């Protein structure tokens, strides 16, 4: 019996004897014969059955030497050491990832490097509010490199954007807004934030932060004392 007849008997359209696999559909058949598991079992089978002449791919190489043009590509791929039962299975293999990958390695091509860096066009410029807070002397022309309000430097626009949207900057901006709003009731040292206490002369009390000072001014006690003064 010829080796090709043996191959046809082992690998049919509905059953793979080497893998003991039932093949119901065309897609299942192609997927099975293309799989690495099948290729490994086929190589093992021919190693254990030398009377069949060994693996078809190896046998064709030995008979034809380095002349790859003499090999029937519909029956065997010498590059991947795989045998096929039909032209459809062979065509599926040659268009698959495994064959393409080995072909690139053979030609010395390197796979493309994946990059996670975002293109410059996708980077958003830092948002600059038009409110008086940001338009204060703390704001500089190079706001994408430095935040005068928080004394923070940036390496790129994306880092600047993240800073301006962060809690620290928003907290400092709100603090400056209160300072500017309360500028008429604070002395120069308090307005510049150089003091740790803020005094209300109307009520004769000292507050530890600008937030407490602002809350005190909105309170009923201060409003009452202000009216009675």
UniProtKB/Swiss-Prot annotation:
Its main location: nucleus. It comes from Mus musculus. A zinc finger (Matrin-type) spans 14-44, 72-106, 145-175, 198-228. Coiled coil: none annotated. SUPFAM superfamilies: beta-beta-alpha zinc fingers (SSF57667). GO terms for cellular component: nucleus. This is Zinc finger matrin-type protein 4. One of its GO terms (molecular function) is zinc ion binding. It is found in: Nucleus. InterPro entries: Matrin/U1-C_Znf_C2H2 (IPR000690), Matrin/U1-like-C_Znf_C2H2 (IPR003604), ZN346_ZMAT4 (IPR051868), Znf_C2H2_jaz (IPR022755), Znf_C2H2_sf (IPR036236), Znf_C2H2_type (IPR013087). Disulfide bonds: none annotated. Keywords: DNA-binding, Metal-binding, Nucleus, Repeat, Zinc, Zinc-finger.
């Amino acid at each position: 019996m010829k080796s090709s007849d043996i191959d046809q008997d082992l690998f049919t359209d509905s059953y793979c004897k080497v893998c003991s696999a039932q093949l119901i559909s065309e897609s299942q058949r192609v997927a099975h014969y293309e799989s690495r598991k099948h290729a490994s079992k086929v190589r093992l089978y021919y190693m254990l059955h030398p009377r069949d002449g060994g693996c078809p791919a190896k046998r064709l190489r030995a008979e034809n030497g380095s002349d790859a043009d003499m090999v029937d590509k519909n029956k065997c791929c010498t590059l991947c050491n795989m045998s096929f039962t039909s032209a459809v299975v062979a065509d599926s293999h040659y268009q698959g990832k495994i064959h393409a990958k080995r072909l690139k390695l053979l030609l010395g091509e390197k796979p493309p490097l994946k990059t996670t860096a975002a293109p410059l066009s996708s980077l958003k410029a830092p948002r600059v509010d038009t409110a008086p807070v940001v338009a204060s002397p703390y704001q500089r022309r190079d706001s994408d490199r430095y935040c005068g309000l928080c004394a923070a430097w940036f390496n790129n626009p994306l880092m600047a954007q993240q800073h301006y949207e962060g809690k620290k900057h928003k907290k400092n901006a709100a603090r400056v807004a209160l300072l500017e709003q309360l500028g008429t009731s604070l002395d120069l040292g308090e307005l510049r934030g150089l003091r740790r206490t803020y005094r209300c002369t109307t009520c004769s009390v000292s507050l530890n932060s600008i937030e407490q000072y602002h809350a005190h001014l909105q309170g009923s006690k201060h409003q009452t004392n202000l009216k009675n003064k």
